[in-house]
């Protein structure tokens, strides 16, 4: 599932994103954030973090640097 989500995002980056002007208000971009989140936290939590990030990417949010949160270590 993780691989599928990452492949979908990479497809977006390669085929759809070049057709639109750059509008992401964040660094890293929302699609790169999604890949990093899914690699770090897995498909479910990483996917959820990606959805939350995309919902924040609008003209009324200032944007800025928003890295993927680190995975919490289990004790």
Curated annotation (Swiss-Prot):
Subcellular location, record wording: Cell membrane
Topological type in the membrane: Peripheral membrane protein
UniProtKB keywords: Cell membrane, Membrane
Domain of life per record: Bacteria
GO CC annotation terms, alphabetical: plasma membrane
Family: Belongs to the UPF0161 family.
Function per UniProt: Could be involved in insertion of integral membrane proteins into the membrane.
Full protein name: Putative membrane protein insertion efficiency factor
Organism: Bacillus subtilis (strain 168)
Gene (UniProt): ytjA
